[in-house]
A protein has these predicted regions:
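C-terminal alpha-helical interaction module
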Residues: 1-144
């Protein structure tokens, strides 16, 4: 989970929607939110070590995790990770990977995708198109 968060924050931490998603639930008055936004952003950077080397390493670990999910699904028939029923394994894996594909109706569905830089949009599209991304989206659409 830490690698998903580190890699993802490495891509999006400077976008205003991220801080809005973190701070808006607290309904801070405008001036207070202005003060807390940079403090929160810097705290997240430190907490998750959002630095190029660590983000790159986390990207590799995320890739390994996605490949493992895809291999597991291929061996088991493709719908669920363990057997032919929705289990805690599916809940855990789908919820940990959901931030990567931003399923509709989740807190991760926070961006107006047209406003994303082309490179980030391509990463999101690539993640959604691969089997693990399709699986996460299906679990959120069908089993939630």
């Amino acid at each position: 989970a830490v690698h998903v968060r580190r890699w993802l924050y490495g891509q999006i931490i400077d976008r205003p929607e991220v801080m809005d998603a973190m701070l808006d639930p607290y309904r801070l008055p405008g001036p207070l939110k202005k003060v807390w936004t940079p403090i929160t952003r810097e705290s997240v950077r430190r907490l998750y070590r959002i630095e190029p080397k660590a983000v790159a390493h986390s990207g590799q670990r995320v890739e390994e995790g996605l490949a493992l999910v895809e291999q597991t699904l291929q061996r088991g028939g493709g719908r669920y990770l363990v057997g032919d029923a929705f289990t805690l394994a599916d809940i855990a894996a789908a919820s940990l990977l959901a931030p990567l594909v931003s399923p509709a109706g989740t807190p991760w569905d926070m961006f107006e995708e047209g406003s994303l830089p082309a490179a980030l949009r391509k990463q999101l599209d690539d993640l959604r198109e691969r089997p693990a991304g399709q699986w996460v989206l299906a679990r959120y659409a069908e089993d939630r």
